Amino acid sequence: MNENLFAPFMIPVMLGIPITTLIIILPSMLFPAPNRLINNRTIAIQQWLTKLTSKQLMNVHSPKGQTWSLMLISLFLFIASTNLLGMLPHSFTPTTQLSMNVGMAIPLWAGTVTTGFRNKTKMSLAHLLPQGTPTFLIPMLVIIETISLFIQPVAWAVRLTANITAGHLLMHLIGETTLALMNINLFSAFITFTILALLTILEFAVALIQAYVFTLLVSLYLHDNT
């Protein structure tokens, strides 16, 4: 196959129009609003996921932080469903786009930082200068800590993008190797196919773990600022 290795990560275009927005909205269709009071299996799964996510992320938060629970749960479900849909063959994974992840991380980071400066002004400013810093190092460390603060959303986005992209690239390479070996040595092809199957299972786990890690980082920064 002569397909470009990075072709799966290119933004899909239909009639000359990028359809990234449509793809991003697609996961919301997996969690439709119930139109009746009687519970069914879909609603039961939604409630279970909501309770589990809330329990894992919100236990350490103060009452002010608890008000962010729905946003954090929605964030986790969105990233997880987007990552899992990207595992389908010939599909596009929006979370492999650094621009999207940065655009998602910056508002969340800005919200937590703004909340911190509004509720804990002195403590937020104190984070810019480690305790016990020598006087002659104060200007330098303040600049370094400020830069570190502004780099945080980029670090979140790069972590998510790199992990999802690396997994998809590795699966693509092993899949191409398996197809090539089928005409050369069936035993070797079977071994690489087994590795591909195990890697696919691992990538499903990574898709969920990365969604959890991204949401957990937002939750931890929120905890420090509320």
Curated annotation (Swiss-Prot):
The entry's keywords: ATP synthesis, CF(0), Hydrogen ion transport, Ion transport, Membrane, Mitochondrion, Mitochondrion inner membrane, Transmembrane, Transmembrane helix, Transport
GO MF annotation, one: proton channel activity
Localization per record: Mitochondrion inner membrane
Catalysed reaction equations from the record: H(+)(in) = H(+)(out)
Annotated transmembrane regions: 5-25, 68-88, 97-117, 136-156, 189-209
InterPro entries the UniProt entry points to: ATP_synth_F0_asu (IPR000568), ATP_synth_F0_asu_AS (IPR023011), ATP_synth_F0_asu_bact/mt (IPR045083), F0_ATP_A_sf (IPR035908)
Top-rank lineage group of the source organism: Eukaryota
Predominant place of localization: mitochondrion
SUPFAM superfamilies named among the record's database cross-references: F1F0 ATP synthase subunit A
UniProt family annotation: Belongs to the ATPase A chain family.
Name under which the protein is recorded: ATP synthase F(0) complex subunit a
Encoding gene per record: MT-ATP6
